[in-house]
């Protein structure tokens, strides 16, 4: 019989860890080699699959070794080929998860089938789906996907449930950097904002040392070690060791005998790297982490004075220069009470305990990293869920058709921060068909966005008249890449003014279209009920607005629109006065037949015109 325990897994880019609740405390489970973390590396050799330290030791010398597969999670079409067989990132990740699962089972003494797995805060919908799929392949029922900084805060906050605090989590791992602002209070953990750099981590610090060693050796001996795979493997191991040593000592000795051979025999590499030199080599990497911290604070609408605690997470935060920079930037001494390599897995185990009921009075509220919405009339991106909204969440809005007798609508689902649909990322498209024939603006189509506890998106559209419904779950091949998230955030900042102007232009054109449509409808209704001169005056004002629209001159469009509005208002007043006169002349004071104001089209004021494509029966499949 399988254990009911839910293990917590930190599936990292460079290293992974697994933990489980024992009593009221989370505990890291050591791997068969006695280490508390396991390298996220898989190698294939002689038909055998190897995971962890043994695979890492052959990362460069064995071409069938795969590292940092996490950076490709959710990437559509990406595969690695080994001995003629192609593997997806989910399959490689599943091999790492299976290894963690196996030694967790050995420790617990029972079969494990359930897990909570962590992901970087910036992982999008596709990447979260891919992580869940990897768990399924590994034989795990993934009960929850949670953000890494959130998990580490959960580990930190377990003993501080009676405190109300705002926490900044600085998470510098092997391959990614995340910063999150969280609020703790009454056992509730709420993420206020997230930010980061998805291509920055400890591997970059190792590479700086490797480049320094390679350049120095080439200058001294005229030999380029970057062309020698065996030498590169030794350099990589030595660079990582030197980096770790420099967290505790001022100088690191790097000794690699027989690293290469020259005309006069074997060549040896002997170097001393001081902490000051290391800081100089890696200063640009440390500086790159500052802006995401400032961005996260800005998104949370906070200052450093509002922050109560600063937590360091990820093995790379052991670097003294990183700790010093965080202290200077925030003005606060970072909290070192949690092992930065283990905090995420511990937090995941606590979340597992919450789900099984072993841990009580703790609620975890995560957020969605980017805004979600659909394309509406004029190519506008209409947001339904803003970024940094707490999940799980659901939001609905009523939309309508853009043409008379429109039989179907296309729902274009988007993710991003720009006002225009074309500048954001398409997540998916689906169609709602068999809409009864009706004038534009009459059908009421309810679009609903649901984001579940794992951050996975479901979108539905329902015709409120027929209750016909269509929906889509965003699949993993339609998500954003890390670069796209960063590009979209930067684009949103750089093009803010131009975007605002473009959106105002589209909004005005949409208003003009709606005005012209409504005026034509009103003029038909009042014909014969008001003087012909008034009708002609309104038609003339309408034609002037049409000309202004064709010219594209925004100022002229505004002026002509206002002029037409005034004419129609005057027309409505006369119609109303005539109706009152008819009412007064009715027998025994009975009301006469009053005409509705021509500007009432029977729509809710909050209804948004959708840019829904007209689909003829021939187009339907």
UniProtKB/Swiss-Prot annotation:
Tell what triggers its expression: By stress conditions e.g. heat shock.
Q: What does it do?
A: Acts as a chaperone.
Q: Where is this region: Disordered?
A: 476-508, 521-559, 578-621
Which family is it part of?
Answer: Belongs to the heat shock protein 70 family.
Q: Which InterPro entries match?
A: ATPase_NBD, Chaperone_DnaK, Heat_shock_70_CS, HSP70_C_sf, HSP70_peptide-bd_sf, Hsp_70_fam
Q: Which HAMAP family match?
A: DnaK
Record's compositionally biased regions (Low complexity): 588-601
Where are the compositionally biased (Basic and acidic residues) regions? Answer: 486-508, 610-621
Provide the alphabetized UniProt keywords: ATP-binding, Chaperone, Nucleotide-binding, Phosphoprotein, Stress response
Disulfide bridge partners, by residue number: none
Which residues are recorded with the post-translational modification Phosphothreonine?
176
Q: Which GO terms describe its molecular function?
A: ATP binding; ATP-dependent protein folding chaperone; unfolded protein binding
User: Which Pfam families does the entry mention?
Assistant: HSP70 (PF00012)
Matching CDD domains, A to Z? ASKHA_NBD_HSP70_DnaK-like
Q: Can you name this protein?
A: Chaperone protein DnaK
């Amino acid at each position: 019989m399988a254990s009911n325990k839910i293990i917590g897994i930190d599936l990292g880019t460079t290293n992974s860890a697994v933990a489980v609740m024992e009593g009221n405390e989370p505990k890291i489970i050591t791997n068969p080699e006695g280490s508390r973390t396991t390298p996220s590396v898989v190698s294939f050799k002689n038909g055998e699959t190897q995971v962890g330290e043994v695979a890492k030791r052959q990362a460069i010398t064995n071409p069938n070794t795969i590292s940092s597969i996490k950076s490709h999670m959710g990437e559509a079409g990406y595969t690695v080929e080994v001995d003629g067989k192609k593997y997806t990132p989910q399959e490689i990740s599943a091999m790492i998860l299976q290894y963690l699962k196996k030694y967790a089972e050995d420790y617990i003494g029972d079969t494990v089938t359930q897990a909570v797995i962590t992901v970087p805060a910036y992982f999008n919908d596709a990447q979260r789906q891919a992580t869940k799929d990897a768990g399924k392949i590994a034989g795990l029922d993934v009960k929850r996907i949670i953000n890494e900084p959130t998990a580490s805060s959960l580990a930190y906050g377990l003993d501080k449930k009676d405190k109300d605090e705002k926490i900044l989590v600085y998470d510098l791992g092997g391959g990614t950097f995340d910063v999150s602002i969280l609020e703790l209070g009454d056992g509730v953990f709420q993420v206020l904002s997230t930010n980061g750099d998805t291509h920055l981590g400890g591997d970059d610090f190792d590479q700086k040392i490797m480049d320094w060693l390679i350049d120095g050796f080439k200058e001294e001996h005229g030999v380029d070690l970057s062309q020698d795979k065996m030498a590169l493997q030794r350099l990589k191991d030595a660079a990582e060791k030197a980096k770790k040593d420099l967290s505790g000592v001022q100088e690191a000795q790097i000794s690699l005998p027989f690293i290469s051979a020259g005309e006069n025999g074997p060549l040896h590499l002997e170097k001393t790297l001081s902490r000051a030199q290391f800081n100089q080599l890696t200063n640009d990497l440390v500086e790159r982490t500052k802006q995401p911290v400032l961005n996260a604070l800005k998104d949370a609408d906070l200052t450093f004075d509002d922050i109560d605690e600063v937590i360091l997470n990820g093995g790379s935060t052991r670097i003294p220069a990183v700790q010093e920079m965080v202290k200077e930037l925030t003005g606060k001494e970072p909290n070192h009470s949690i092992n930065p390599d283990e905090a995420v897995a511990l937090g995941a185990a606590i979340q597992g305990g919450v789900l099984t009921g072993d841990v009580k009075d703790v609620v975890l509220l995560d957020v969605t990293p980017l805004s979600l919405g659909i394309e509406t009339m004029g190519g506008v991106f209409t947001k339904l869920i803003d970024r940094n909204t707490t999940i799980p969440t659901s939001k609905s809005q009523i939309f309508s058709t853009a043409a008379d007798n429109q039989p179907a609508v296309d729902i274009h689902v988007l993710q991003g921060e720009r006002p225009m649909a074309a500048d954001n990322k398409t997540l998916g498209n689906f169609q709602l068909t068999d809409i009864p024939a009706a004038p534009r603006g009459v059908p009421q189509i309810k679009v609903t966005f649901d984001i579940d506890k794992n951050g996975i998106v479901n979108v539905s559209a329902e015709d409120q008249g027929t209750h016909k419904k269509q929906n889509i779950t965003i699949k993993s091949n339609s998500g954003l890449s890390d670069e796209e998230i960063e590009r979209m955030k930067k684009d949103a900042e750089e093009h803010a003014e131009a975007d605002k102007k473009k959106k105002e232009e589209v909004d005005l054109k949409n208003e003009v279209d709606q005005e012209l449509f409504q005026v034509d409808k009103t003029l038909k209704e009042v014909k014969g009920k008001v003087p012909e001169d008034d009708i002609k005056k309104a038609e003339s004002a309408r034609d002037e607005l049409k000309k202004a629209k064709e010219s594209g001159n925004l100022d002229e469009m505004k002026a002509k629109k206002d002029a037409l509005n005034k004419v129609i208002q005057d027309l409505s007043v006369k119609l109303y006065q005539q109706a009152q006169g008819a009412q007064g002349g009715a027998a025994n004071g009975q009301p006469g037949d009053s005409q509705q104001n021509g500007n009432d089209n029977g729509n809710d004021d909050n209804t948004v015109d959708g840019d829904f494509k007209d689909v003829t029966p021939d187009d339907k499949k």
